[in-house]
Amino acid sequence: MHINWKKIGPYLIIIAAVLWALDGILRRSLFSLPPTIIVFYEHLIGLIIIAPWLFKNIRNLKFTKREWGALLVVSIFSGVLGTLWFTTALVKVNYISFSVVFLLQKLQPIFAMTFAIIFLKEKISKRYLLWALVAMLAAYFVTFKNGLISFNTGDETLKAALFALGAAFAWGSSTAFSRFALLRKSNTVVTGVRFFLTTILALIFVFIFGQQAALMSPNS
């Protein structure tokens, strides 16, 4: 049975967007857990789920040095740093609106296209540049009322905005590197390897931040 991915693709993106939206709501309920623990377990669970398909395609686990490099960048930025920054921004909802965090995070297509131009040699139109500028300006005014940064809460509002923007940068830039890795490999293999690498990296971050006690005891 032939699957027309051009027709199905947009619907899969819509489903993914819905899941990401739910992810943010569920993530807030895990406020008692360190962000590194959340990152570790979400990727460990994902790895366990995708493992059967990964082992089925184990013969295809041959990557060039550049592909391994791209996967490592994706794992570090998208898997670890992006999720850490996004979670940190959500924790600061006392200083910045929950919806603003999501809106800033949605700027990632701008970063995705920027890196696609640099690394994938894709071309963009002047119209795209115009709308990208409009999006950045809109994001600024959505974040800071009347265009003025309020320091009544110290610098926490600015920090929260920067964390959300950092997540957009991490996830957006990783999109281009993911695309590079997918040029010659199946999405199942690339996704499986990404989850594997991110799980290991997240565990390393857990020990770097001295939060290993929370691995088995969330209240630690």
Language-model features: locations:
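Membrane-interface helix termini and inter-helical loops of multi-pass transporters
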Residues: 25-33, 90-97, 143-157, 206-220
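Hydrophobic alpha-helical transmembrane segments of multi-pass integral membrane proteins
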Residues: 7-15, 37-52, 69, 73, ...
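Hydrophobic/small/kink-forming positions within alpha-helical transmembrane segments
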Residues: 21, 25, 75-80, 84, ...
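Juxtamembrane helix-loop boundary signature in multi-pass membrane transporters
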Residues: 1-14, 109-169
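Specific transmembrane alpha-helical segments of multi-pass solute transporters/efflux pumps
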Residues: 22-24, 57-99, 105, 141, ...
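Specific alpha-helical transmembrane segments that line the substrate/conduction pathway
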Residues: 37-48, 87-121
